[in-house]
């Protein structure tokens, strides 16, 4: 999906929510590409702290990115799918009017997902969060990877995998 399709979908979603008398907040960096009269354009952090639900427009990759980015705000995410894969992004564009109206009326169920904390130890260490699963790879080199998996500081699995 292109950026123009995402912008068109964002404008349409904002219009539908405003017609339902919802308060619509949008990141101020989207004002030029997604302007809709009646939307409040604010810094991202203010949008995230004030909103009840975060809307993402894209595919599952967009939701995975936003889930990690918005973790500290503990807000539900509704994904409007304009991508190829819509397992997590459960609202299709042609369902937007119906689903956004139901959202404003409070007629929805939350689907909780497992969020994993991931920490890579070593010289190039990294840490972050993942939604549902983590893929560990060494790249293209044929080599063994030795790793340990912990849950609540208890060793769950110790593995040596040849790639």
Language-model-detected regions and their locations in the chain:
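Redox-cofactor binding/interface segments in oxidoreductases and associated redox assembly factors
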Residues: 56
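Short glycine-/acidic-enriched loop or helix-start segments at secondary-structure transitions
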Residues: 36, 65-68, 89, 146
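Short glycine/serine/threonine-rich phosphate/pyrophosphate-binding segments
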Residues: 6-7, 61-67
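Conserved small/polar residues in nucleotide/adenosyl-binding loops
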Residues: 161-163
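ATP/NTP phosphate-donor binding region
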Residues: 1-53, 94-109, 120-128
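Catalytic core of DAGKc-family lipid kinases
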Residues: 85-159
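Short glycine-rich anion-binding loops that position phosphate/pyrophosphate groups of nucleotides
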Residues: 2-3, 60-62, 85
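Short, acidic/small-residue loops that bind anionic groups at enzyme active sites
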Residues: 73-91
């Amino acid at each position: 999906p292109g950026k123009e399709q995402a912008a068109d979908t964002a404008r349409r979603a904002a219009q539908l929510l405003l017609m339902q008398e919802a308060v619509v907040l949008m990141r101020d960096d989207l004002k030029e590409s997604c302007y809709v009269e009646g939307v409040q354009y604010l810094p991202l952090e203010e949008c995230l702290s004030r909103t009840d639900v975060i809307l993402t427009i894209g595919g599952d990759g967009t939701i995975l990115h936003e889930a990690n980015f918005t973790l500290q705000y503990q807000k539900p995410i509704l994904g409007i799918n304009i991508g190829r894969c819509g397992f997590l992004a459960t609202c299709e564009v042609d369902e937007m009017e119906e689903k956004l109206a139901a959202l404003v009326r409070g007629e929805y169920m939350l689907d909780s997902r497992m969020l994993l904390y991931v920490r890579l130890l070593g010289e190039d260490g990294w840490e972050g969060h993942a939604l549902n699963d983590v893929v560990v790879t060494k790249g293209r080199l044929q080599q063994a990877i030795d790793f340990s998996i912990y849950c609540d500081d208890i060793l769950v699995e110790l593995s040596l995998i040849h790639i």
